[in-house]
Structure formats: C-alpha cells, structure tokens
Amino acid sequence: MHKDGRWAREILQLQKPEGHWGYFHTLSETKKFPVTTEQALRRLEILGYTLEDEPIARAVVYMLDCLEHRREIPDRREKLHDWDVFTDLMLAAWIRRFTGDCPAANRVAERWAGVITKTFATGEYDSAAYIRSYENTFGLKPAGGRLTDFVSFYQISLLIDALDEKTERAMVTYVLNHEAGIYNLYEKILNRLPESFASREANRYLSAVELLAEYRSGRESLHFVADWLEEQQNDRGIAGL
C-alpha cells in the first residue's frame, strides 16, 4: 500500500467536492455510495494521509461544518441511539484523528472526559456513575449500544490526550479486560491474543491494540502484544508496536 497507489486513487476519486464520500457512517446504498466517509478516512489515514493533504483538509472542514450545524451528514437518523450525541461524538473523534487544534471537537472531548473521569473516580468502572454523569452532561440517559457501553472506537479515539493519568490508566485497564473488546474494531477481549497471526481476526485485533497504544499508559499495558509480534518477526518481518 502506498500513499500515491491505486487504492488511494480509487478512494480519492469518490470524494465529493464538499469533502465527504456520501453517507458518513451508514452502510447502505452501496451502489450510490460505495464507501462511507469514515471508511475513506480510515483507509487514507492508514495510507499516511494527514491534515497537510488537501483531501483530508477538505474532509475536516466538512466535518467541522457538520459539528457546528452548518451542514448535516446525510445519514438517516437512527432511533436506537441518542443521535445528536452520537453524531457529535463521531465527527469530533474523526476530526481529532487529524488535528488537536479544533476547539469544537475538543469541547466534545472535554465533555466525554468529564463523564469518564467521574465513571472511574474510584479507580474502577462504576456503571451507575457513568449513567449519572452521562445524564448530567448530555441531558438524557444513554441509549443505544455505542453509548450505554462507552467502549467503542469513537470514545476511545476521542479521549486520547484528554484524560488525567489516573483516569486514563483505570480506563485502559478496563478496556483491556472488556469482554466485548472495542466496538467497531475488535469485539473480543483484548487481553487474549488471537489464535492465528495470519488471519483477519489478528488484523482487527492489531487495529484495536494500535488505538489503545496511542494512550500514554496503553503501551505500558501492551508488552505482551509486543512480545507476540516479536515472535512473529523473524519469519514474517512484522514491525513491533
């Protein structure tokens, strides 16, 4: 894979002038929109695209317009979620993948950081504290799987560099031991290595681990993964964490 390769060109050809790729999140109408905006952003990020690249800069401007309600993402409102809270969460998380200098996205991160700080105030996850803090922050009780359980790609990505050391360490420990893994990335416990390295499951596992490794305390907790990668390195030439 290469930044100027075929895969990148195919994705960039699908980008709309406004900066999006069609639906932001919804996996439907694939003939109309072959890729969602977040799928395109994830692939371009993997290929090494940054805010300095015009397609990403244009996408970030679009997402900021949506976050500040000058535009709306075209996805159908999902009734099973707190849609407005969820939309702000998605947009802010993706903006912060590419820049930490967006006040609107950082405000969303600060609100979620407040929720998570109260959730882990005792050093361990407190479900009642999470629900109470969420309701106090957002004005309603959490609804929908991605919000009643905060361990999804969006929250974990959004909160990088947003938590104090004590809260971060407690949260990382909780996520590593979370039986359902990280929603949207790898939905098995992260403290258990995949059975096969050469598998799609291992690829998904490494995506989740790489996200968690972006936390200061994440790398300290992931030595067992680094050891596993080192075992594979001689035969496969895989770089460690």
Please tell me what each predicted stretch does.
Residues M1-L241:
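Preference for long, amphipathic alpha-helical scaffolds in soluble/luminal domains
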